[in-house]
Amino acid sequence: MLTIDLGSLSYAEAEAVQTARLGEVSTGGEDTLYLVEHPPVITLGRNGGIENLHAGRGFLAERGIELAQSSRGGNITCHFPGQLVAYPVFRIERRPGGLRSFFHDLEEVVLRTLHTFGLEASRHEGRPGVWIDNRKICSIGVAVRRWTTYHGLALNVGRDLSLFNLITLCGLPDAEATSLHRELDDDSVTMQEVKDVLTRQFLAIFTHPAVAAGEAAL
């Protein structure tokens, strides 16, 4: 598995990077994990979500917030500096369990990452992503083309979650956003530390599929 840190990159540019790599991975290239932070952007998934946006295009444009249609699954969400986004461009044709197992394993990567930092999170049946009670700390939305995944997960790290005030998170009125720093009440964990742990968990889960789900590999 290759891991490439894209630094800060616009949503459209990151999607172009993924789709270019997808063609290579789907024909035998090595699975590739991209890590990135995006400038402020609100994205709409294949399930729509414009009805859950509470600001007009003019309001967003004045504040430098992009609005983008995405090919990923799911509803509305947002990305911003201080949120770690991971895009696994992985071939899943021969992976046991197919896309359902892949999605479960993405959640497992995040659960183990948070556990490393002392946070116990969980899955919620029927509500994709990773949660701490009713607070969503990580959104997940993927797309598949030619048996190869793209898009992925967005883990909130920093305290500033103000962009979420402009949307109904994932179309769920009772859900609220949270982050690693908020839950720890401690801002000392760096983005690089989170990247390092998340990458290790991707390696543990996706290159060692025999490891039982839920068994910490810390």
From Swiss-Prot:
Keyword field contains Transferase: yes
Cross-referenced SUPFAM superfamilies: Class II aaRS and biotin synthetases
Active-site positions on this chain: C170 (acyl-thioester intermediate)
Binding site for substrate: R72, G73, G74, N75, I76, T77, C78, H79, S139, I140, G141, G152, L153, A154
Lineage of origin: Bacteria, Pseudomonadati, Thermodesulfobacteriota, Desulfovibrionia, Desulfovibrionales
GO cellular component, one term: cytoplasm
Biological function: Catalyzes the transfer of endogenously produced octanoic acid from octanoyl-acyl-carrier-protein onto the lipoyl domains of lipoate-dependent enzymes. Lipoyl-ACP can also act as a substrate although octanoyl-ACP is likely to be the physiological substrate.
The protein's annotated pathway: Protein modification; protein lipoylation via endogenous pathway; protein N(6)-(lipoyl)lysine from octanoyl-[acyl-carrier-protein]: step 1/2
Domain BPL/LPL catalytic: 27-210
Gene name of the encoded protein: lipB
Nucleotide-binding is among the record's keywords: no
Family the UniProt entry places it in: Belongs to the LipB family.
Site residues by UniProt (Lowers pKa of active site Cys): K136
EC code(s) of this entry: 2.3.1.181
Catalytic reaction equation(s): octanoyl-[ACP] + L-lysyl-[protein] = N(6)-octanoyl-L-lysyl-[protein] + holo-[ACP] + H(+)
Compartments it resides in: Cytoplasm
Keywords: Acyltransferase, Cytoplasm, Transferase
Annotated InterPro entries: aa-tRNA-synth_II/BPL/LPL, BPL_LPL_catalytic, Octanoyltransferase, Octanoyltransferase_CS
GO molecular function: lipoyl(octanoyl) transferase activity
Single GO biological process annotation from the record: protein modification process
Organism of origin: Nitratidesulfovibrio vulgaris (strain ATCC 29579 / DSM 644 / CCUG 34227 / NCIMB 8303 / VKM B-1760 / Hildenborough) (Desulfovibrio vulgaris)
Major enzyme class: transferase
Identification of the protein by name: Octanoyltransferase
Miscellaneous section: In the reaction, the free carboxyl group of octanoic acid is attached via an amide linkage to the epsilon-amino group of a specific lysine residue of lipoyl domains of lipoate-dependent enzymes.
